[in-house]
Design a protein with these regions (language model features):
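Short beta-alpha connecting loops at secondary-structure transitions
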Residues: 67-71, 146-159
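Short Gly/Pro-enriched loop/turn and capping motifs at secondary-structure junctions
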Residues: 110, 144-147
Length: 202
C-alpha cells in the first residue's frame, strides 16, 4: 500500500473482501505508515498484489506523511496534500525509480511524520512573503533511523509549499543526469542537495 497517496475506497474494499476470504491472513501496519499483508500462499499473494496495482512503485512514492492539517486539529499544514502533489509532479517528470529517496513530512512540530529521521524531511511552517504569511515547510536533510546509523536531519531553511514539487523534480533530474541513484550521488556530491535547494530556500 502506498503511504504517499491514499488508495481509493474501491481498492480498500476489494482488498478487504479478498482478505476476508483468506484464513489466517493479517494486515499489519508499520511505524512508517505502510502495511504488510502476511500469512498468504504464493497464489494468494499474487491475487492480493494485483489488487494494489497503482500504489507505491518506488521508494519516493512510499514516502511517509502524517494525516495533516486537513484532519488533525494540531497540524498547521496539509502534509498529505503536499505529498500527493509531489508524487504527481515526480510521476509526470518520469524520473528514474531510484532518483529520489523516501521523504518524511510532518504538518507541525509534533513530528508525526518523523521528518527529522528521513533522508529528506519537511515540517509545516509559515514564510513571510511581502509581509503576508504563506504556507511553507521547513526542510531537513540527512536524517537516518537505521540501527547503528541513527542521525537527526539538519534544518536547512524554509521552502514555500507551492515550490516543493518543483524542487524535488529538479533534484531528481540532477541525480538522474549523474547516472547514479540518490544514495550514490549524495556520497559522490555531499553538497549537491543543498546546492539544488538553495534557490528554493531563498
Amino acid at each position: 500500500m502506498c503511504s504517499s497517496d491514499l488508495p481509493d475506497l474501491k481498492m480498500l474494499c476489494a482488498l478487504s473482501d479478498a482478505l476476508a476470504n483468506i484464513p489466517e491472513a493479517e494486515l499489519r501496519l508499520t511505524p512508517n505508515e505502510t502495511a504488510f499483508i502476511i500469512n498468504l500462499t504464493g497464489e494468494e499473494a499474487q491475487k492480493v498484489l494485483a489488487l494494489t496495482v497503482g500504489g507505491a512503485e518506488t521508494a519516493f512514492e512510499a514516502s511517509v506523511s502524517c494525516i495533516g492539517g486537513q484532519t488533525c486539529q494540531v497540524g498547521t499544514r496539509d502534509s498529505q496534500g503536499l505529498l500527493a502533489a509531489c508524487v504527481a509532479a515526480v510521476r509526470e517528470a518520469k524520473l528514474p525509480a531510484d532518483a529520489l529517496p523516501c521523504i518524511h513530512i510532518s504538518g507541525c512540530p509534533s513530528s508525526c511524520g518523523t521528518h527529522q529521521t528521513g533522508a529528506m524531511g519537511f515540517r509545516g511552517a509559515s514564510k513571510l512573503v511581502d509581509g503576508k504569511p504563506q504556507a511553507a515547510f521547513t526542510f531537513f536533510l540527512g536524517g537516518n533511523s537505521r540501527q547503528g546509523q541513527e542521525a537527526m536531519g539538519r534544518e536547512l531553511g524554509v521552502m514555500l509549499e507551492e515550490r516543493i514539487p518543483a524542487f524535488l523534480v529538479e533534484l531528481g533530474q540532477t541525480v538522474a543526469a549523474s547516472g547514479m541513484d540518490f544514495d550514490a550521488w549524495r556520497q559522490a556530491d555531499p553538497d549537491g542537495v543543498e546546492r539544488v535547494a538553495a534557490p528554493y530556500l531563498a
